[in-house]
A protein has these predicted regions:
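Short hydrophobic transmembrane-like helices used for membrane targeting/insertion
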Residues: 834-836, 946
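Flexible, low-complexity extramembrane segments of multi-pass membrane transporters/channels
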Residues: 118-121, 830, 948
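Residue-identity detector for glycine
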Residues: 827, 832, 940-943
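Soluble extracytoplasmic regions of secretory-pathway and membrane proteins
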Residues: 7, 14-822, 836, 841-916, ...
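N-terminal membrane topogenic signal
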Residues: 1-8
Length: 948
């Protein structure tokens, strides 16, 4: 039985290893193709090495204990027996061979489970071995922060692992003793009722007792180590008024743990000594003292001190520790370098202010990402099998002007092919890639209410500054399945009229399929026998897999966390993706934890230390370190020297497009609402708590999202690309401040908070929304549209600082109403994405969101006009000329009829520039038109012909 079981066990292990090898080989080929083979082997050997070490330790501990048990008690007898009135009638003994088989099976299963779990902790081991100091220390134990980030997690892992191993070893040993009679359980039972009638009596031989006492000593010694580690764990306490160790923790619990360490160590020594001399009274006495120490020092004393000493004097006692919490939380979330600026709000905005901030005004965003995505899907999807996943926001220099641009990639979704065309060949060999993108400025709209497109159609037409020479997208956000390229059949490239254009992949992406063995392995890996049997493959064929952006970066560096919105960049004629990567930890001392981010894990330290770039055509991936001071990324750089590159090696054109990531900003904003209060008493009383304001989207009230904006900061000389969000006081709607994160080099990463005067009312977003609803004319017009078969969508309300004041801009879109079933199927809107498939869009016909009105508020004035220019001019009482340039003189003409022709020409040009959002030229044409009309007016009065 034993031999058969051993053979079966090792056979299962061999099958698992073989299956793992089948999966490992394609992974290695993929890493090697990207140039990250050393990274692959470091991770693989670390996983297997650490897992094997855990397995070996478990086997060693259990086998040594079983060997000792067999030597100490070689006999065989019943371990469980019950006695009736007429003697023993039931014995629950287990035969030696059966128990041996059960033990072997138990050990094999347990060792595999524990070793597998241990292998997943490989990065904790490597971070411990390669840890880099942070240069700062905690305020209680004066240990380097690196100890908490790297050493403490490893010590906790080792201690917990050993404790579990020795507890399992004790249980296995007890099972062995139960089997051979060294441990016996006897009791009485009722024959009539068949149930025990008394508590069972447990007896154990002296040798078995000594063995189990020795194991108990090891377990108690591990508990002593646990008390030592718990001292450091006090820095993550949540018991006080702030996160981290408080007065009771520092003055009582630290002392209590030191006492318990001594008591536990002494008790363990008593157990070790009595494992040889066996004085049970001494063991019971020592155990009682140890338990008493735990009850008094770990439980009772802290409760009494907290209730009778700390609570009545909480602010005085806890003040130093609240200050630690404020200081270390701000450091952990990189808020300690936030620059505070007083923002004295004015009620006036002059023509000179408009002129000074013309670039800001030209880049006011009137296109919301959500309706714009629907519009793109309607006017630029081109074919059923194309789709846009989300809309990204970036900035480009176009015609030598700094422009904020919205972009969305046109990706191919093979599941949207018609049923007859949804064949294996089409899915994996022909329809292999998306094509091009749609891009539009944030502020321009056509006369039909649609975006003016900088990049459009297939093949793409584009602005010269947004040239695209490689529009193919093999790697994107929706590329979930593998494809085969350089096969004997051509790939679909893009549609043209009634025919299609085909191509053959010319890039370096993909893993070569050189041999029958590789075909077999890939067929097994993807559970697809067609790879093995297809005749379309050639010696040059390649297979592309792991093509989705988030997965691609995550497989190479799974120890990093990734932003939820990788964004597209057009650079040097190609399409790239930039993915923000973070180093995080939940072990930063005294720092408040934040939840709900990155796989829903808690964290209390975060840095955007790495920028990842991915070539959409070749799939090349590069990791650039942008924060060289971060100890976590420095540690990973030591572990993986071939993975990371310095930021100065990033191509210069891509550097222009790095931006402050939204996920990080949202975490920082959430933290800053409370931790902007640096005064301990104010923090304790929560006197100045802020909150993120709400806004309306459509008819729903939701929390306002951070938004990108091009603007000139106060005291700065030029405009820059920022991510910003306003704040309101807790449970209030007026604005109290706003936070801005800078994206342009060399100021990338700088945070500025502008604090508004508390004694003056500055409208918050919901107050503006309420004023819109209360404005009779606007409310009536919106209601009428809603009653005439249109859905009114109120987009993002943006609070835009101009000089030392704010203007508020909210776009209004109209969309043909959907049927109720369609509306319910779309779900709730999410940032940057509208959960409407292309098939749904096709069925919706004319349901295209069109920008029809723009609401602008300034001070106590609020208007709704057909376009932003009219709205700004109306609310500010200033004609919007972003650039006051010298206008050229109008050429001489002979009579008034020619003046009329010229007036019409300038009028038409002005309309064209208005649609384009070219405020400078628009203003110039209006100025010329005004001059001509004045001449016509004066000449009409005099009745004479004019020469001008």
């Amino acid at each position: 039985m034993n031999k058969k079981l051993i053979i079966i066990g090792f056979g299962l292990i061999a099958v698992l290893l073989l299956w793992s090898g089948v999966s490992i080989y394609p992974d290695w080929l993929w890493f090697e193709n990207l140039g990250f083979s050393p990274v692959f082997w470091t991770m693989l050997l670390s996983k297997f090495g650490f897992g094997f070490l855990v397995w070996l330790l478990l086997i060693l501990i259990i086998c040594l204990n079983l060997y000792a048990a067999k030597r100490l008690n070689p006999g065989d007898g019943p371990g469980v027996a019950f006695k009736a009135a007429d003697g023993y009638v039931s014995q629950l003994g287990v035969s030696g061979r059966a128990l041996n088989s059960l033990l072997i099976a138990f050990i094999l299963i347990l060792s595999f489970v524990v070793a597998s779990k241990g292998s997943f902790q490989w990065d904790i081991l490597l971070r411990y071995l390669y840890q880099q100091p942070s240069g700062s220390t905690d305020p209680i134990f004066n240990r380097d922060i690196g100890f908490y980030l790297f050493s403490l997690p490893f010590y906790i892992l080792v201690r917990d692992g050993l404790l579990v191993l020795f507890i399992f070893a004790g249980l296995v040993t007890m099972g062995w003793y139960l089997k051979n009679g060294a441990l016996q359980i006897e009791g009485e039972f009722s024959q009539a009722e068949g149930v025990p009638t008394s508590l069972p009596k447990i007896t154990i031989t002296p040798k078995a007792k000594k063995h189990l006492i020795f194991l108990g000593g090891i377990i108690v010694l591990l508990l002593a180590w646990g008390y030592h580690l718990k001292m450091y764990g006090l820095l993550y306490s949540t018991q006080g008024p702030a996160f981290g160790a408080g007065y009771t923790d520092v003055h009582i619990k630290v002392l209590a743990y030191k006492v318990l360490i001594i008591a536990s160590t002494a008790f363990a020594l008593v157990l070790f000594v009595n494992a040889f001399r066996l004085r049970m009274k001494l063991i019971w006495l020592s155990g009682g003292i140890w338990i008493g120490a735990v009850l008094v020092f770990a439980i009772l004393l802290p409760i009494l001190i907290q209730k009778f000493v700390v609570k009545p004097n909480e602010l005085a006692k806890e003040s130093p520790y609240i200050a630690y919490n404020i200081d270390y939380t701000r450091k952990a979330y990189n808020l300690n370098r936030t620059k505070k600026v007083d923002f004295e709000v004015s009620d006036k905005l002059s023509a000179e202010d408009i002129k000074k901030h013309d670039v800001t005004i030209q880049n006011i965003r009137i296109w919301d990402e959500r309706p714009l995505l629907q519009t793109y899907r309607q006017i630029q999807t081109i074919r059923l099998y194309y789709d846009f996943n989300n809309v990204d926001v970036d900035r480009y220099l176009i015609n030598n002007q700094y422009r904020q641009v919205m972009l969305a990639t046109r990706e191919l979704v093979v599941n949207q092919l018609p049923p007859r065309a949804n064949t294996w060949v089409n899915r994996h060999l022909i329809y292999t890639h998306g094509y091009g993108l749609a891009a539009s400025p944030v502020n321009e709209v056509t006369s039909e209410g649609l975006p003016r497109l900088f990049i459009k159609d297939v093949p793409p037409s584009f602005e010269p500054d947004l040239k695209i020479e490689r529009p193919e997208i093999y790697y994107g956000e929706k590329t979930d399945q593998y494809v085969l390229v350089k096969t004997k059949t051509e790939e679909f490239d893009y549609p043209r009229g009634d025919k299609n254009v085909y191509t053959i992949y010319q890039g370096s992406g993909g893993v070569p399929i050189k041999s029958f063995l590789r075909r077999l392995l890939f067929a097994v890996e993807f559970l697809d026998p067609q790879i093995l049997f297809t005749t379309y493959l050639s010696p040059e064929s390649k297979i592309m897999y792991n093509r989705r952006i988030a997965r691609r970066a995550g497989l190479i560096a799974p120890f990093l966390d990734y932003d939820g919105d990788p964004y597209v960049v057009v650079s040097r004629g190609k399409i790239y993706w930039i993915q923000d990567a973070y180093t995080t930890s939940d072990m930063y001392p005294y720092s408040r934890r934040s939840y709900g981010h990155f796989r829903n894990k808690g964290l209390n330290y975060i840095r955007n230390s790495v920028k990842v770039t991915i070539d959409a055509y070749n799939g090349d991936v590069a990791f650039y370190i942008i924060d060289e001071k971060d100890p976590i990324v420095k540690t990973y750089s030591s572990i993986f020297p071939d993975l990371f590159k310095p930021f100065n090696e990033m191509p210069a054109d891509l550097k222009k497009h790095i931006r402050y990531p939204r996920d990080l900003f949202e975490i920082q904003v959430d933290t800053y609402t409370k931790y902007h209060m640096e005064d301990v008493q104010v923090f304790y009383n929560q006197e100045d708590l802020w909150q993120i304001p709400d806004e309306l989207y459509g008819d729903s009230r939701q929390e306002m999202e951070p938004y990108y904006i091009i603007m000139k900061l106060p005291e700065e000389e030029k405009e820059e690309f920022l991510l910003m969000l306003p704040f309101t006081p807790s449970r209030k709607d007026n604005m109290i401040g706003w936070l801005a994160a800078r994206s342009d080099l060399p100021n990338y990463g700088s945070l500025l908070v502008y604090k508004l005067p508390k004694e003056k009312l500055v409208y918050g977003p919901m107050q503006i929304e309420a004023r819109v609803d209360q404005q009779t004319d606007i409310s009536r017009e919106l209601s009428l549209w809603g009653q005439r078969g249109s859905r009114v969508i109120r987009g993002n309300l943006l609070a835009i600082p101009i000089g030392d004041t704010f203007i508020y801009v909210e776009p209004v879109y109209l969309e043909a109403k959907q049927e109720e079933s369609e509306l319910s199927s779309t779900g709730s809107p999410q940032r940057g994405a509208v959960p409407v498939s292309s098939q749904q869009d096709e069925s919706r016909g004319a349901a295209i969101p069109e920008l029809k009105r723009v609401i602008v508020a300034f001070g106590n004035r609020l208007v709704m006009e057909e376009n932003l220019d009219k709205a700004l001019s109306s609310v500010l009482d200033v004609q919007i000329f972003p650039k006051q340039l010298a206008f050229p003189s109008i050429p001489q003409i002979q009579d008034i009829s020619n003046l009329g022709v010229l007036a019409l020409e300038h009028y038409n040009k002005a309309k064209d520039y208005l649609r384009q959002g070219n405020w400078a030229e628009y203003g110039r044409e209006l100025e010329n038109l005004e001059k001509i009309l004045k001449e016509i007016s004066s000449s009409g009065k005099s009745g004479t012909s004019v020469k001008y």
